[in-house]
Curated annotation (Swiss-Prot):
Listed name of the protein: Zinc finger protein 394
Protein family: Belongs to the krueppel C2H2-type zinc-finger protein family.
Taxonomic lineage: Eukaryota, Metazoa, Chordata, Craniata, Vertebrata
Compartments, as annotated in UniProt: Nucleus
Keyword Nucleus: yes
Length: 536
């Protein structure tokens, strides 16, 4: 890596790990405000997941892709080689087989070569495992849970049953070997969430003992697993079938299977530390000096509690939200949503993204529905009509507010402007007509009619400029000022004079231009009109 004092590009975030980047030449500096850029992984996902339905047309779709790609790749900070390395690494992780992809991503490779080395290491391990001593189908079946057995194809189940009739039959080379080996590998790669859920299902029925410190009981653990039985309802039929089907596959009688189940069920309610009378005899534990069944009590001192206990507690919370119908959570504010699309829309409130722009005035919105409502101010459309009096409104909320005047006395109309308000809000509204300014700045004591105007004014004192131009990184305290500034980059002129067709970037320029036509109608000479223009 070249020596220098420059600042390297920011890390790429979780999921797609950072690429090794050379430092810039001495004296180079990161552009001001670059620290305010959002997480590159978030930008990458926005670039990859942009849908055509979210934009107004093909031109806007192309423009959005350019903007999102630039936010992700940061060409002002990275060289061409570094950008190519980033793209190749991402595509390499995408095309990897699923079992390799998860392993490589977990190790966070910093370059394509490192990712390839990790993939090769795992591939060799998997290939070596398939060449080891053959495992019998009985061994494979013993390692399968009931859920995994149910997921096996019917043909593979039949093949396993035929093979287990011969106790010495092995999983030989061929298609069947590959199929069963894949199942075993998938089992070993089960996620912690799935493992936690299976463990909770067994614990909630008392089928397995919970190993904690010596002397703890199952009742001690019930407090740590609140409402486990409610959150993890078990269906009896698959579980009961599992007690007979899989033992029968292994050649174990139903009585033997039931006796083993009863052994676990009873041990779940025992105090860990009591004597367990079995034919295997008792041994004295060297740590606590008590006699216990060999192997069972020893786990209290040698084995930590189930590795998924902490994950299981988190799983309970996740399942509760899933059953309530809000499975999608925002990582920034932890607010939950029913639909993934609602989560994407909400995340724009954190990123400040406003992809929907009005072609008439250039105002941008984060939601397409807000753009549709805004466009009615230009078209004059009023699609919502009152069925009682026939009055029409632009928005459904305005219609709902109007309909209250027909059926309730709690809502009154302002005599000054005709708007409808609740009685408690009407008095506040009337202050505006009286010239009252109830919202006062504590710094300069300037007063405002609206609270939102006060918030905007306070940014003058705090110096806060939350709105940034992604082209030149200049920042502004007002969103309207940012919109006007962005037109200097796009060349957009949304304000059109309907008399001569000339267009302008700002509404004030249009108003100043329209005075020319007004003076012409008033009978003034053209020379005087040009003189007024020069004097402005």
């Amino acid at each position: 890596m070249a020596a220098g004092s420059g600042v390297a590009p920011p890390p790429l975030g979780v999921g797609l790990c950072a690429v090794k980047v050379e430092e810039d030449s001495p004296g180079s500096q990161e552009p001001s405000g670059s620290g305010d850029w959002q997480n590159p992984e978030t930008s990458r996902k926005q670039f990859r997941q942009l849908r055509y339905q979210e934009v107004a047309g093909p031109e806007e779709a192309l423009s959005r892709l350019w903007e999102l790609c630039r936010r992700w790749l940061r060409p002002e900070l990275r060289s061409k080689e570094q950008i190519m390395e980033l793209l190749v690494l991402e595509q390499f992780l995408t095309i990897l087989p699923r079992e390799l992809q998860a392993y490589v991503r977990d190790h966070c490779p910093e370059s394509g070569e490192e990712a390839a080395a990790l993939a090769r290491t795992l591939q060799r391990a998997l290939d070596g495992a398939s060449l080891q001593s053959f495992a019998t189908f009985k061994d494979v079946a013993e390692s399968l849970t009931w859920e995994e057995w149910e997921q096996l194809a019917a043909a593979r189940k039949g093949f396993c049953r035929e093979s287990t009739k011969d106790p010495g039959s092995t999983v030989g080379p061929g298609l069947e070997t590959k199929a069963v080996t894949t199942d075993v590998i998938l089992k070993q790669e089960m996620s912690k969430e799935a493992e936690s859920q299976a463990w909770l299902q067994e614990v909630s029925q008392g089928k397995v003992p919970v190993f904690t410190k010596c002397g703890d009981t199952w009742e001690d653990w019930e407090e740590r697993l609140p409402k486990a039985a409610e959150l993890l309802p078990l269906q009896s039929s698959p579980e009961e079938q599992g007690r007979t089907a899989i033992p029968h596959l292994l050649g174990v009688s139903k009585d033997e299977s039931d006796s083993k189940d009863n052994e676990f069920e009873n041990s779940g309610s025992l105090v860990l530390g009591q004597h367990i009378q079995t034919a295997e005899g008792l041994v004295t534990n060297g740590e606590c000096g008590e006699d216990h069944k060999q192997g069972l009590h020893a786990k209290c001192h040698t084995v930590k509690p189930h590795s998924s206990v902490d994950n299981a507690l988190g799983l309970l919370e996740s399942q509760r939200h899933f059953q309530e119908g809000r499975p999608y959570k925002c990582d920034n504010c932890e607010k939950r949503f029913r639909q993934r699309s609602d989560l994407f829309k909400h995340q724009r409130t954190h990123t400040g993204e406003k992809p929907y722009q009005c072609q008439e005035c250039g105002k941008s919105f984060s939601q397409s529905a807000a753009l549709v409502k805004h466009q009615r101010t230009h078209t004059g459309e009023k699609p919502y009509a009152c069925p009682e009096c026939g009055e029409c409104f632009r928005q459904s909320s305005h219609l709902s507010r109007h309909q209250r005047t027909h059926g309730s006395e709690k809502y009154c109309k302002c005599e000054e402007c005709g708007e409808i308000f609740h009685i408690s809000s009407l008095f506040k509204h009337q202050r505006l007509h009286k010239g009252e300014r109830p919202h006062k700045c504590e710094v300069c004591e300037k007063s405002f009619k609206q609270r939102s105007d006060l918030f905007k004014h306070q940014r003058i004192h705090t110096g806060e400029k939350p709105y940034m131009c992604f082209v030149c990184e200049r920042r502004f305290s007002q969103s309207a000022t940012l919109i006007k500034h962005q037109r200097t980059h796009t060349g957009e002129k949304p304000y059109k004079c309907f008399q001569c067709g000339e267009r302008f970037r700002q509404s004030t320029h249009l108003v100043r231009h329209q005075r020319i036509h007004h003076n012409s109608v008033s009978g003034l000479r053209v020379e005087k009109q040009h003189g007024n223009l020069l004097s402005w």
